[in-house]
Amino acid sequence: MNPSSTKVSWATVTLLLLLLLLPPALLSPGAAAQPLPDCCRQKTCSCRLYELLHGAGNHAAGILTLGKRRPGPPGLQGRLQRLLQASGNHAAGILTMGRRAGAEPALRPCSGRRCPSEAASSVAPGGRSGV
């Protein structure tokens, strides 16, 4: 028997050990069951990240932009939840939700007197009013 043919590389041994030990560890009941944190169960804190991670669907875009988004009105949160829980990939809708919610509101007309911004814009460059 040739001694060089019986040598096994450490990489092969490591790979075999991983293949033998990893599947039982992943299939064990302790690894599969992830208990809900107390704050989420009692609703004492915001569990948005936990809900994103454990909900159904593709949440990559929502998780990546979670820290960049400003807290919005409750309607925005509800729309995000509907997008996340629906089937399919809604990355484009999720990524543009913050932009749409942060859009400038339409200007409302002033009641009664003229608006200060209008009065300032109607002054001629020489300092005389164009009114």
Curated annotation (Swiss-Prot):
Subcellular location, record wording: Rough endoplasmic reticulum; Cytoplasmic vesicle; Synapse
GO MF entries: neuropeptide hormone activity; type 1 orexin receptor binding; type 2 orexin receptor binding
Key word Hydrolase present: no
Keywords: Amidation, Cytoplasmic vesicle, Disulfide bond, Endoplasmic reticulum, Neuropeptide, Pyrrolidone carboxylic acid, Synapse
Function: Neuropeptides that play a significant role in the regulation of food intake and sleep-wakefulness, possibly by coordinating the complex behavioral and physiologic responses of these complementary homeostatic functions. A broader role in the homeostatic regulation of energy metabolism, autonomic function, hormonal balance and the regulation of body fluids, is also suggested.
GO biological process: eating behavior; neuropeptide signaling pathway; positive regulation of cold-induced thermogenesis; positive regulation of transmission of nerve impulse; regulation of neurotransmitter secretion; response to starvation; sleep; temperature homeostasis
Family per record: Belongs to the orexin family.
Sites of Pyrrolidone carboxylic acid modification: Q34
Gene Ontology CC terms: cytoplasmic vesicle; perinuclear region of cytoplasm; rough endoplasmic reticulum; synapse
Presence of keyword Disulfide bond: yes
Coiled coil (UniProt feature): none
InterPro entries xref list: Orexin
Disulfide bond sites: C39-C45, C40-C47
Pfam family, one: Orexin
Name of the molecule in the record: Hypocretin neuropeptide precursor
Region described as Disordered: 104-131
Modified residues (Leucine amide): L66
